[in-house]
Amino acid sequence: MKKLFISFMALLCTLGAFAQSTAENINQPKAMKPIIMVVPEKAWCINQGFVKDGDPKSPDYEKALLNNDVLNVITKMGGIMQERGYPLKNLQSALDELKNESAMDLALVSKADGEIVEDEFDQLTRVAQTDILVNIAFTRTTYGPRNMVEFRVTSIDAATSKQIGGETGRSSASGAPISALLEESVLGFIDNFTGSIQRHFEDLVANGREGSVIFKIANDCPLTFDSEVNLNGDTGELNEVIDYWMNEHTVNGSFTQNGKTRNRLSYEQVRFPLFGKGKFGGKPKAINMDGFIKPITQFLSQFGLSVSTTPVGIGKAYVVLGGK
């Protein structure tokens, strides 16, 4: 009887430990995954003739998506990424959203002024608010009724345009649709490909997204970046005060000042958090560089300055200082 009681108690302990382990696994948050957008590779679009009218060096993604093979390949690659848990931003939806963005007409200065220029690709990544771009290119070789297709995919950080990873694959010669040939080629390397993306994104979560900021002095600004100002009882130059703000707000104080004149101040390798505080006590929300740097406008107003910010893509922003 005593042995039976001991065995029963041991069973209860085992079941309790299993239940606790199961509850912990259920409550454990899932790993965050970056938002992906699949796009045809820029060089591939140009080589295939999918370019803007009158500008043979600028890809036209709208034209590319009118091609059935391109559309099928992008749709299939997006589906493969979604199956692995990656949120997907649709390229066509982003293009449509960009066309409907009326604020773009007011935000930027023309190239002739030598000021802030945002090309269409920067506009696209800003509107899409995607973390990673998956560029895809393919070459079809025909053998009678059969096709063999070579694919090239690269992952790009949307904020910096730096390559994260890249893979190539080749299908067997087959009469199957191009989407099936893509799947055959990609499945051999997809784990390595998505693994490099996930490692990069986990670094962004831990150490911040990388970007750049350029400060400029407007004609009506009463100060230059060499002007002396007072802050917290200390005296220093305006550029030093901006350095102070950057050090206080970047992730781990990570940034590099890579250029300074009286009227221009630039920073690279600026690590800013993926999420910022929501207004009015709201939930944290995903931010781009413009969202990160915008609070400096209030900080600089104490020196009699009016400050405006303009985003370029998701990883770059211009900050213009003027007089009140």
Regions found by a protein language model. Give the residues of each.
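Short, flexible helix-coil linker/hinge segments at the edges of structured domains or between repeats
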Residues: 94-112, 156-178
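Solvent-exposed coil/turn segments that connect beta secondary-structure elements
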Residues: 41-44, 93-94, 139-141, 154-159, ...
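Envelope-exposed proteins and targeting segments
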Residues: 32-34, 84, 129-134, 147-152, ...
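Amphipathic beta-strand/beta-sheet edge segments enriched in Tyr/Trp
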Residues: 131-175, 318-323
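N-terminal segment of the mature soluble domain
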Residues: 50-127, 133, 236-275, 281-302
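C-terminal/domain-edge helix-coil "capping" segments
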Residues: 20-35, 40-48, 162-254, 313
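Bacterial Sec-dependent N-terminal signal peptides
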Residues: 1-23
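C-terminal basic regulatory modules in eukaryotic proteins
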Residues: 291-324
